[in-house]
Amino acid sequence: MHTFEIYEEYYDWAPLEGDSEARVHLLTYGGEDPPNMYQPQEPLVAKSYIDDVRMTRREYKRLLWMELNKINGVPKPVTLYEEAGAYMFYLALPGRDAAVFLQEQLPEVVVSTLKQIGRYLSFLHKQDISECPFIYSEAPIHTDLVFSHGDFKLSNVIVNENYITGSVDMIGIGVRDRYFDLAAMALDIERVLGREYLEYFYEGYRIKDHLDQEKLDKFMELVEA
């Protein structure tokens, strides 16, 4: 029995909301033998880009690169399965997506969580980019280069009991200007929670007092394009 058959046989598959281009399932181990040390019993995520094996390979390759470079707060890859399509499997981050979580919370929890999201992004942006092979910074607008998430929005941030466990949908990671991620999250916070909550995200990132609004606006246009 190969790995995919083990996952089909011994894990319960529950569909998750995600990118419309991908099928995403949460896998929980149901017991009664296998799996063993090579098929972990922790919850897994199975993800497959619909009709595009290359995109599934691409995201899995990025997860492997982040694991090799010891980047924390991101999914840990388990395996890639290919046969008439492709599925990537990774260890599930505990918690729920922040877009759902925050809409159920009292304002003080929303404020605290947004500050944490800002701190998490600041941590991600501090990762070493000297050996990063994924470059998206050719345009002149990219001047302050960092390790970028590439699709940093509330639904891609995972929250567990009021703390951030990491982020998902890592297919777009790479070298960009820090304002690309700042703009993407700012747009999403405005849409989901309201403009009045932006300051707490900026405070967590420690950019509140020196935010370049003109540059942010330009990147908002780029993100929305």
Model-derived features: where do they sit?
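Short pocket-lining segment of the protein kinase catalytic domain that shapes the ATP-binding cleft
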Residues: M88-R96
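An alpha-helical support segment within catalytic cores of ATP-dependent transferases
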Residues: M1-Y7, P94, F101-G150, D212-K215
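Short, amphipathic C-terminal "tail helix"
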Residues: L216-A225
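Active-site Asp-x-Gly
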Residues: V53, L145-S148, N160-L211, E221
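A general structural signal marking secondary-structure boundaries and capping sites
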Residues: E67-K70, L121-I129, L193, Y205, ...
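Active-site acidic catalytic loop and adjacent metal/ATP-binding pocket
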Residues: R23-P40, F123-F180
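Conserved N-terminal boundary motif of the eukaryotic protein kinase catalytic domain
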Residues: I6-P15
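A conserved alpha-helical element in kinase catalytic cores
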Residues: G18-A22, D33-P34, E42-M88, E104-R119, ...
